[in-house]
Amino acid sequence: MLDPNLLRNELDAVAEKLARRGYKLDVDTLRQQEERRKVLQVETESLQAERNSRSKSIGAAKARGEDIEPLRREVNELGEKLDAAKAELDRLQQEIRDLALSIPNLPDDSVPVGRDENDNQEICRWGEPRSYNFDVRDHVTLGEMAEGLDFAAAVKLTGARFVVMKGQIARMHRALAQFMLDLHTEQHGYLETYVPYLVNHDTLYGTGQLPKFGADLFHTRPLEEEADSSIYALIPTAEVPVTNLVRGEILEESALPLKMTAHTPCFRSEAGSYGRDTRGLIRMHQFDKVELVQIVRPEDSMAALEELTAHAEKVLQLLNLPYRKVLLCTGDMGFGSSKTYDLEVWVPAQNTYREISSCSNMWDFQARRMQARYRSKDDKKPRLVHTLNGSGLAVGRTLVAVMENYQQADGRIQVPEALRPYMNGLEYIG
């Protein structure tokens, strides 16, 4: 959520920045709401003061032996007017909050202006895609040859966009997650966390999935019943529970940066993606991911974004997977992001790069929703932290990349050296 002071005092500048990402801010409505809020605020304060004054007069009149009934009626009438004004002010403030919750984050000035992924800016490439002297197979074919990917069984059990993994393919999937966690905890300084896969709606509001993206989630009960605290949603990413660990907290400055990682399944309805990536593991309703989260001081967040992205890149480098780093344009960034890098891994069967990690600096956008703050020795009042997150990496898509980039002419899959300690020294699958 944006700073309310920006919406009150710098509305035109905010609207211009939001326009860069293709969002049209309803400036007129916001101005009208703010003017009405000021009027109601003054009215309620005036009625409260007058009611207090007249209430005190009752005691004085009673001491003088005067008839206090007229004063009581007046106080009651003032109370009714005050209650009505407060109710209207509460309704208006809720309208303002609802509108504020629907407004995306402001893009950083370093983000290129553009409409969609075609306007993203490639920063660099790492590694050279391998040349093959045989017809390249995709991961679905390779997985079936290894008797390790069974999509038909998943359809029987659940439906489309699910998979059953077996044997050495399932083992490699597990090995990848273990390898990523060990790298991030032992070399990059992250604290491993285990978190719930079901979260409440306060948690989803905190990181920005609600109220705007409820249709993308799997809920235990209909979303319309959200007033019931027993309604949960399956997490779309570990970013949601891990970041919310600091919700409502005031951290000591000495505790920052706080770096956490978690390996979880992720659940997404993929609303709006009908017909896209229907074959294989690229776009699933359930997939595993190792998430990286950093909670930092505001002045450190841009450097932290570079560091976090480098940590995700290190996984690809150690697996020797060619990739490219892309800076997303304003029109392609996520709702809560101020700046995002995507890492795209080379997928031979598609002859292109596909997203495998998205690393974002959220500024204080999530922190304001969560009221996540820290106490600085230089400030009397606690300040909002900045939050960052990124995939380190998406495990299923990493499996796709390993299977296709390490495939052999006979259909076997070579196990990357970095993974062999996690697979009892196994060199080939199939």
Curated annotation (Swiss-Prot):
Enzyme Commission code: 6.1.1.11
Keyword Disulfide bond in annotation: no
Domain of life: Bacteria
Reaction equation(s) it catalyzes: tRNA(Ser) + L-serine + ATP = L-seryl-tRNA(Ser) + AMP + diphosphate + H(+); tRNA(Sec) + L-serine + ATP = L-seryl-tRNA(Sec) + AMP + diphosphate + H(+)
PROSITE patterns the record matches: AA_TRNA_LIGASE_II (PS50862)
One GO biological process term: selenocysteine biosynthetic process
GO molecular function: ATP binding; serine-tRNA ligase activity
Annotated spans, Disordered: 44-65
Subunit annotation: Homodimer. The tRNA molecule binds across the dimer.
Family matches, as NCBIfam families: serS
Protein name: Serine--tRNA ligase
Organism: Edwardsiella ictaluri (strain 93-146)
Taxonomic lineage: Bacteria, Pseudomonadati, Pseudomonadota, Gammaproteobacteria, Enterobacterales
